[in-house]
Amino acid sequence: TDEIASSVRAAYEEAEKVKTDIREKGEETLRYIDEHDILGIVLAGRPYHIDPEINHGLPELINSYKIAVLTEDSVAHLGQVDRPLIVSDQWMYHSRLYKAANYVKTCDNL
């Protein structure tokens, strides 16, 4: 129905807004790291690791040492992956990890 199609479109639009927000916050954090000459770390866990019951406060612990914490999806758009890969790259999550890792290796403070 039209209502379902409209709802699906709205959901996809919102998902894109969320991705954009995450990327912009990642870029903002990277600028902060550079401006304040501090370190950052990219936590590249599974998406469910954002749950405090699973990550046991690790991001907050790292941050308490004045180390900025970023997620892989906040920096993956900044990296490129040389292809072909020597691994099977069939999942989007792993593709983002490869991009994030390739970006991180170019940064002295990450």
Region annotations inferred by a language model:
Residues 1-110:
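An N-terminal assembly and electron-transfer interface module characteristic of large anaerobic redox
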